[in-house]
Amino acid sequence: MTYKSFIKPFKLLFATALLFTLSGCSVYNFTGTGKIDAETFQVNYFQNNAELIEPGIERTFTLRLRDLIQNQTNLSITDTGADLIYEGEITQYRVSPMTATADQRAAQNRLSISVNVRFTDRKHEDNDFEKSFSFFYDFNGDSLPSGSVLTAALEEIFERITQDIFNASLAKW
């Protein structure tokens, strides 16, 4: 048996194995979503219905959710008639003391935000849900939730809430 006659079947076997391996990779991606049976999504404007209002957070949240889905999937965004629809409202924006000092002042405060989400999957109605998502950010009691403190708080809170919404709706975690 010559070297060439030995290598030719080996190359064919290797190419076939590689083809099967790569074809299986299309079912899963690094975001954990697997194959999504949809082509389009829409994120309707989330109203701020919290008792305490921080102007502009509803727009920031809506854009964050839209950007996360757009960046982590191959879905196309649309304004109407989408396969997947996200809508809801911000239901809570609350600042509360977490720990106190000896002179009864807040040593640490917590900003909590809750968002009620209605998710509709027009192709698979059994995936639809309405659910509340919330997260918090702790900050120094000497600070107010404004400026850089508020920016950092919203960044962390919205990152967590939007990822939780993404996982619940598309990754099924």
Q: What are these model-predicted stretches?
A:
Residues 1-25:
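Sec-dependent bacterial lipoprotein signal peptides
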Residues 79:
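Short loop/edge segments at beta-strand edges and connector loops
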Residues 22-63, 67, 74, 82, ...:
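A structural "domain/chain start" motif
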Residues 48-55, 144-154:
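Second-shell loop/turn segments in exported
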Residues 150-173:
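Compositionally biased, intrinsically disordered linkers/stalks adjacent to structured regions
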Residues 29, 71-73, 83-128, 132, ...:
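Surface-exposed short loop/turn segments
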